Amino acid sequence: MNEKIENLLKEERKFPPSKELKENANATSSWYEDADKNRLEFWQKQALTRISWYKEPTEVLDDSNPPFFKWFKDGELNLSYNCLDRHLETDSDRVAFYWEGEPGDTQEITYQDLYERVCKLSNALKQLGVQKGDRVAIYLGMTPEIVVSMLACARIGAVHSVVFGGFSSEALADRINDAKAKTCLLYTSPSPRD
């Protein structure tokens, strides 16, 4: 193996946060101390208390094949559930994200609104025959719908592949075909405003 790569795999340097960052961070100094004492135990605790699992992982880190590390490889979760559902009981009206497009074109998307949009699209994808493991190409602009599309795919276990909108039709076809996409989500007009 290349010596430079080998050296990077054995990185020992530490980069502590600045005083200002520490004072304004959500993490307390005890977090840093706990992480320093036993990083695997620290991350296991974070994963088990901050993430909803369908099947809790029994192994924190598989580092048997560097640099292809696998974290929590035997755990099972749903990203869409963790991003949306777990917030509905207490924070449904809280803003999940702010979107800003053209000047004056802004939206505040609440968890409840995002959840409803995601469920509607994930059900539509299922009606089209999209299943867990299928690939869905996403050819959308930078709009709230791109977030909805990615979370809808995650909700049903489909893999999304965002395709850059600046490619020629031939390049788009190549990428969509290479991904073996079962379906493609796109606008029917060049711009969502048209």
What are these language model-derived features?
Residues Y187-D194:
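Conserved small/polar residues in nucleotide/adenosyl-binding loops
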Residues M1-I109, D113-E116, K120:
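N-lobe entry segment of adenylate-forming
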Residues G157:
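Structured binding elements
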Residues A179:
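Active-site charged/polar residues at nucleotide-handling catalytic sites that mediate phosphoryl
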Residues T183:
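Short, Asp-centered acidic motifs that coordinate Mg2+ and/or phosphate
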Residues S80, F97-L151, S168-A173:
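Conserved AMP-binding/adenylate-forming core of the ANL superfamily
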Residues V163-F164:
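Short beta->alpha connector loops at strand-helix junctions that form conserved
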